[in-house]
């Protein structure tokens, strides 16, 4: 059993991107589903679906590539807040990633959302990861 499911998810996506796999399988949780939904809305992944196998739920994520050389859409994916060191930010100090070309995923009291939506709503929260 993995202690940090978010880091496990991000690492699996990063590794699959490096070897240009089309699909990556991740153990499903509420948080991983919320992160996958944001990645899909922002255009970083193609699609995702859940399935059950031996009473365990998994998430299948379809990764996106561009061009003939199949360059990954996700250039970098980085965990910020970790179980040993939580990172919080208020709405005024939410990070801008590459002048808003990338996103930060924030866990707020109103759910998991991007830094842009959290800033728009005027709420802060725990900075989970950066993606660009």
From Swiss-Prot:
Subcellular location: Plastid, Chloroplast
Keyword Repeat on entry: no
A Gene Ontology term for the protein's cellular component: chloroplast
GO biological process, alphabetically ordered: translation
GO molecular function terms attached to this record: rRNA binding; structural constituent of ribosome
Primary localization: plastid
Keywords: Chloroplast, Plastid, Ribonucleoprotein, Ribosomal protein, RNA-binding, rRNA-binding
Pfam families in UniProt: Ribosomal_S8
InterPro entries: Ribosomal_uS8 (IPR000630), Ribosomal_uS8_CS (IPR047863), Ribosomal_uS8_sf (IPR035987)
Function: One of the primary rRNA binding proteins, it binds directly to 16S rRNA central domain where it helps coordinate assembly of the platform of the 30S subunit.
Subunit structure: Part of the 30S ribosomal subunit.
Family membership noted in the UniProt record: Belongs to the universal ribosomal protein uS8 family.
UniProt-recorded name of the protein: Small ribosomal subunit protein uS8c
């Amino acid at each position: 059993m993995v202690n940090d499911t978010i880091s496990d998810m991000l690492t699996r996506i990063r590794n699959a991107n490096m070897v240009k796999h089309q699909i990556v399988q991740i153990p499903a949780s509420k948080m991983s589903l919320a992160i996958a939904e944001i990645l899909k809305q922002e255009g970083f992944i193609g699609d995702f679906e859940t399935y059950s196998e031996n009473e365990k739920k998994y998430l299948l994520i379809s990764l996106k590539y561009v061009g003939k050389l199949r360059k990954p859409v996700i250039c970098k994916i980085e965990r910020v807040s970790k179980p040993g060191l939580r990172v919080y930010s208020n709405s005024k100090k939410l990070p801008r990633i590459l002048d808003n070309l990338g996103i930060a995923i924030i866990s707020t009291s109103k759910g998991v959302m991007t830094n842009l939506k959290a800033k728009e709503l005027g709420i802060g929260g725990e900075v989970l990861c950066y993606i660009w």
